[in-house]
């Protein structure tokens, strides 16, 4: 599996002829460059232009299968589970809702629904936290086996702080931790919290299941 990072919460995972995009960036985003590659599956965690650009993951006549929201899915033999969590990313403080976003996206606790996705791809289990801003996960998710890889947001208004991001990553006991939604300051703080100031920094990451053997909470930084 090959992993690349494309700003914000956008991650591309490719193996063989299959490409999955997590959090594709829309052309309407004011913060990040829109996604510019084709994908077979697009996972949408949050109904916000920074993360709902499934149309940008289309190429020619090929359109991705879009997974958007909690539930159980199976696409091309890949089982995907989505779990409802909370995010306040991109909310208008005066209304507690993002501009132009439907009230159905609002949680009962305030904020918006952020879907955390769990799946196994190319023999590697992945947990993608999206734009989550809470450290308490749904019971069903907490009871699952430890993931091989967790993608965790560490900066941006409305997501976890670097400190909370590290606490959640530690609790999840993932073999590999990859930060998303980071800037230089928040990344530095997150790496300090994790005791990984000398973490490996790469433009793309190629992994096989055997590469994860013996790893415990190792942080790798993917450059956009």
Which positions does each model-derived feature cover?
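Active-site-proximal beta-strand elements of phosphoester/diester hydrolases
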Residues: 2-5, 20-23, 77-85, 118, ...
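Binuclear metal-ion centers of metallo-dependent hydrolases, dominated by the metallo-beta-lactamase
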Residues: 4-6, 176-224
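Pre-active-site segment of Zn-dependent metallo-hydrolases
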Residues: 10-72, 81-92, 110-112, 132-143
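Short acidic-hydrophobic surface loop/beta-edge motif
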Residues: 11-13, 69-76, 119, 207-212
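Proline-aspartate-enriched helix->loop->beta-strand connector
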Residues: 39, 149, 156, 165-182
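Short Gly/Ser/Thr- and charged-rich N-terminal loops/segments
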Residues: 98-101, 105-109
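Mobile, glycine- and charge-enriched loop segments
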Residues: 111-158, 223
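Enzymes that bind and transform nitrogen-containing heteroaromatic metabolites
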Residues: 139, 143, 154, 161-165, ...
